[in-house]
């Protein structure tokens, strides 16, 4: 069969842009139609959603979304406000409420434009089977991830509303899971979209379970 050779420049706007690097109009057009989206940490749901949005919304040089790996919901708030080149961010709904309630920022919600809800997140607690529910966490060593993410915000809010007073520790999730297995922690709180990799990849030897979270209270 006869093969037909195609000129890549005729079918690829990207190639046209690359090889017209000297064109001021090309530079302006690329920058005008590109937005950056700060997401979350590697392995989290935000990163995957960022990649999915970039793929679904891609419209050649008319619209391009560039997802950026971030540090978590709280850090993303600061990045959107202050970091040069960041246009959008994925932020947990309760993060802005927490920052205002605790006096970190006044009227911070007025500094943002809400775009859309992406999905629901779940709060899960991995613990030894001796811990049946959150009410058993008083005085226990509980990891709530690092303080620049959103997990600690959700966890501390739930603890306050339920009147629970654990020993809160800020440990990166993968490290926290290992400490839990070694008996150095009593529970690990995870908040994210389902399925969350740190939960689904957790190698349970039968000693641990997803303990109950009493939302009704």
Language-model regions: role of each:
Residues 15-18, 77, 90-92:
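Hydrophobic, small-residue-rich alpha-helical packing segments that form membrane-like cores
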Residues 106-118:
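A structural signal for short loop-to-beta-strand junctions that line the ligand-binding cleft
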Residues 93-95, 102-104, 165-217:
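Pocket-lining segment of extracytoplasmic ligand-binding domains
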Residues 61-64, 84, 183, 205-206:
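N-terminal secretory/targeting leader peptides
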Residues 1-66, 110:
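N-terminal hydrophobic or amphipathic helices and topogenic motifs
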Residues 64-75:
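Early extracytoplasmic/lumenal segment of secretory-pathway proteins
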Residues 75-78, 85:
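Mobile, glycine-rich extracellular loop/lid and propeptide segments
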Residues 32-59, 65, 120-182:
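Bilobed "Venus flytrap"/periplasmic-binding protein-like clamshell domains
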